[in-house]
Regions:
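A sequence-composition feature that detects small, non-aromatic residues
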Residues: 48-51, 57, 101, 132, ...
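Short Cys/His-rich Zn2+-coordinating modules
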Residues: 85-98, 120-127
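Generic alpha-helix signal with a bias toward terminal, lower-confidence helices
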Residues: 13, 58, 108-111, 131-135, ...
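Glycine- and acidic-residue-rich phosphate-binding/metal-coordinating active-site segment common to enzymes
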Residues: 115-182
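N-terminal start-of-chain detector that recognizes signal peptides
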Residues: 80-81, 90, 110-112, 148
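N-terminal accessory alpha/beta regions
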Residues: 2-90
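Short cysteine-rich loop/turn motifs with clustered Cys
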Residues: 96-118, 142
Length: 182
């Protein structure tokens, strides 16, 4: 696995740009509207969640993060998915492309074989909506690795895959051997 430095930009630097152009969001049934103000009110919760993410990730304890934070009282996971797919991927496309371009030679850091094609939500946006647009939660990867991982539930440390931003496996010794001369 290729180690990548965590993104140089954080949510506070990109959130307003992602929100540009939001006036309302029409739900499927045509009756509920989400206004810009509702997304803007989320920012303090999302920034706190991002800070928690870094703290847990640096201690290799992302499995301890709560699935849904208190932000779910304000806005639901479908709204955060919408924010990612309709705004981050479109008005925030420059940030998406910067994240996608991070691996050396555009090779997937998970498998080291295929070209980076998309971003993986390390903690799924369905179970952890508070991290749907958190740059450190978005890992550049190939299509196959992203879909092989999918949104596996995290119940403990054994459920986590290596995180290219926080797990540098290239610095430790993994193979030990002893030679005896006869």
């Amino acid at each position: 696995m290729e180690y990548l430095k965590p993104p140089e930009f954080k949510l506070s630097e990109i959130y307003d740009k992602i929100l540009m152009g939001i006036t309302k969001k029409k739900e499927d049934d045509g009756t509920v509207y989400r206004l810009f103000d509702e997304y803007h009110k989320l920012l303090p919760c999302l920034l706190e969640a991002e800070s928690d993410y870094y703290s847990f990730a640096e201690d290799n304890k992302l499995y301890l993060i709560e699935e849904r934070s208190r932000m779910s009282q304000v806005i639901d996971s479908d709204d955060m998915k919408w924010l990612y797919t309709q705004k981050f991927l479109k008005t925030g496309r420059g940030f998406y492309d910067k994240l996608r371009a991070r691996p050396k030679n555009s090779i997937c850091p998970y498998c080291g074989k295929r070209d980076v094609y998309e971003l993986d939500h390390y903690l799924s946006k369905s179970d952890y909506p508070q991290y749907a647009v958190t740059p450190a939660n978005l890992i550049p990867c190939c299509h196959r690795c992203n879909h092989k991982k999918l949104s596996k539930k995290v119940h403990g440390i054994s459920d986590l895959v290596l995180n290219p931003y926080f797990d540098d496996i290239n610095t430790g010794q993994w193979l030990f051997c002893t030679f005896e001369v006869q």
